[in-house]
Regions:
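Sec/Tat signal peptide C-region and signal peptidase I cleavage site
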Residues: 42-49
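Bacterial N-terminal signal peptides that target proteins for export
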Residues: 14-38
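Flexible, surface-exposed loop/linker segments and immediately adjacent secondary-structure boundaries
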Residues: 50-198
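General helical structural elements
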Residues: 7-9, 14, 30, 192
């Protein structure tokens, strides 16, 4: 918690002084709240982006999405306000996993000899791949995975069942129930891709 104190002067007890001190106190409160929110990484809205790391560069688009380009030819497009964290599981200095807690990501991971499996981890699912383009949407207690191109394996973190998706396939992963692969209707695909500026 950030504490602040405004000096007690004679000016502070006049009507103009009280108004000025009230404005100053509000400004300090807003600044303190901004610092506190920023330090916990609670980012949302089209103008705010997650910091790029692990050698990735970041750019905001006109649609409010954020595009990360990583040195290993991995591209990640994040929906405006998406909450995610890039990870380097094998500690080689390159991103090989993303933890997604809210909203959607579109990922393109080219197939490369010797590359470790790339994962997107949400509270409900792990989507693993070795060369494809796919989207993952974490919303509340459900994670949806859709494959644009290639193949993606989807499983629950606890290992209770898994499925493999091909191009045009999707699956909704909820806390219980079977993982059912479905061909997504064009309207659903279009709506998800629009959120990702595609």
């Amino acid at each position: 918690m950030i504490r602040y104190r405004i000096a007690n002067t004679r000016f502070a007890h006049t009507p103009k002084g009280k108004a000025a001190m009230t404005i100053l106190a509000r400004a300090v409160s807003i600044a303190a709240a901004s610092i506190t929110v920023g330090s916990f990484g609670l980012l949302a809205g089209p103008a705010l982006a997650q910091p790029a790391k692990l050698g990735c560069t970041s750019a905001l688009t006109a649609q409010g999405t954020q595009t990360l380009h990583c040195p290993t030819a991995i591209t990640i497009v994040a929906e405006s306000g998406a909450k995610f964290e890039l990870r380097d599981r094998n500690r080689d200095g390159h991103v090989d996993s993303v933890e997604l807690s809210n909203k959607a990501l579109l990922l393109e991971v080219p197939k490369k000899q010797g590359r470790t499996r790339f994962d997107v981890v949400t509270p409900q699912a792990i989507a693993a791949v070795r060369g494809t383009k796919w989207a993952v949407d974490a919303e509340g207690a459900k994670t949806s995975v859709f494959v644009v191109d290639g193949r993606v394996s989807v499983a629950r973190p606890a290992g209770r069942g898994s499925v493999v998706l091909g191009a045009g396939d999707g699956v909704d992963v909820e806390p219980s129930g079977d993982l059912i692969v479905k061909r997504w209707p064009p309207a659903r695909v279009t709506a998800l891709m629009a959120r990702l500026g595609q």
